[in-house]
C-alpha cells in the first residue's frame, strides 16, 4: 500500500522533527523514504556546515532505507516542487512539518507551503503542525487511535484506504466521525450503510463511529484532543457538498488539530 514516502525538509530542527513519523511508517510498510531539500540558491540560513544536515535515522530504525537528495527550486514555488517530486518518484505518501525557520517561513515549510500541498496534492499527505499554541501535542512516531472523518459523500472515502492501511499495520484503533452541518439531512441509520460500503471498498471493517453536528471543525478538533487521537484523516472536500477545494472545515482541522492530519484532494 505504501512503498515510497517523500519527506521534505529545510534542515531546520522543526522541519526535521517530522522525520521520525516518516521513518516509523516506512518501517511498518517496508517502504523507502525520499528525504529531499529544495535548494533556494540564495538562502543565507544554509551554511556550509549545515547544508547537508539531513536528519539521521532514529534509534532502532537502521533497516529503513533513506535516499537523500537536494533538488533545485527553479521557477516553481516550493509546494509545486514537492508535489512534482512526489509524483516523479511515484511516492504513495508525503510527510512534512507545517513550519520551518520562522524568518523564512514563507520560503519553504511555512504555513502557506504546507497548506498548499495539503490543499492541492492528490497524493495522501500527512501534515504535522510543529509550532505555535495549536502545535501537535501527541508523539508523532506512534499510533494508537486514528480518526477517519467523513460527511458520507463519495469524495470523503478516498482517504479511508490509506487510513485503514496505517491502522492495520500499526494495530491502531480506527474510529469514524460522521459530520453533519446545519441543514444536512441525516440518514435514518445514522450513516451505517454508507460507512459499511466505504469500508468494504477500502478492504476494511467499520467499527466504532460517532456523529457530530453543528460547528463540525471545532467539534472534530476538540474530540481529537479529548480522546488523544494520534492521526486525523480527512479529504479537502470535507463538508463541501462535493467540491474538492479546501473547505473551511478541512482548513480549520489542518490548522488546529492536536495531532498530525492525513489529507488529500479527491479526484
Label the model's feature ranges.
Residues 45-46, 106-107, 137-138, 159, ...:
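Short, well-ordered secondary-structure micro-motifs
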Residues 69-81, 211-219:
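Charged docking surfaces used in two-component/phosphorelay signaling
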Residues 186-238:
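Glycine/small-residue-rich hydrophobic helix-like segments
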Amino acid at each position: 500500500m505504501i512503498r515510497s514516502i517523500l519527506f521534505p525538509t529545510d534542515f531546520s530542527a522543526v522541519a526535521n522533527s517530522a522525520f521520525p513519523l516518516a521513518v516509523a511508517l516506512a518501517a511498518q510498510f517496508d517502504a523507502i523514504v525520499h528525504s529531499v531539500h529544495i535548494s533556494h540558491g540564495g538562502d543565507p540560513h544554509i551554511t556550509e556546515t549545515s547544508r547537508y544536515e539531513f536528519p539521521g535515522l532514529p534509534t532502532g530504525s537502521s533497516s529503513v532505507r533513506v535516499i537523500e537528495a537536494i533538488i533545485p527550486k527553479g521557477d516553481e514555488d516550493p509546494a509545486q516542487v514537492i508535489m512534482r517530486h512526489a509524483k516523479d518518484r511515484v511516492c504513495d505518501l508525503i510527510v512534512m512539518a507545517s513550519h520551518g525557520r520562522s524568518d523564512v517561513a514563507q520560503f519553504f515549510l511555512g504555513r502557506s507551503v504546507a497548506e498548499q500541498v495539503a490543499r492541492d496534492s492528490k497524493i495522501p499527505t500527512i501534515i504535522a503542525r510543529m509550532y505555535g499554541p495549536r502545535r501537535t501535542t501527541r508523539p508523532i512516531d506512534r499510533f494508537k487511535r486514528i480518526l477517519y472523518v467523513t460527511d458520507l459523500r463519495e469524495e470523503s472515502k478516498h482517504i479511508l484506504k490509506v487510513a485503514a492501511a496505517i491502522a492495520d499495520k500499526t494495530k491502531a484503533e480506527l474510529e469514524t466521525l460522521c459530520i453533519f452541518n446545519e441543514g444536512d439531512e441525516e440518514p435514518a441509520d445514522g450513516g451505517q450503510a454508507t460507512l459499511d460500503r466505504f469500508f468494504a471498498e477500502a478492504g476494511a471493517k467499520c467499527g466504532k463511529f460517532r456523529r457530530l453536528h453543528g460547528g463540525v471543525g471545532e467539534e472534530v478538533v476538540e474530540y481529537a484532543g479529548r480522546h488523544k487521537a494520534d492521526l486525523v484523516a480527512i479529504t479537502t472536500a470535507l463538508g463541501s457538498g462535493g467540491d474538492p477545494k479546501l473547505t473551511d472545515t478541512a482548513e480549520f482541522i489542518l490548522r488546529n488539530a492536536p495531532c498530525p492530519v492525513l489529507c488529500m484532494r479527491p479526484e
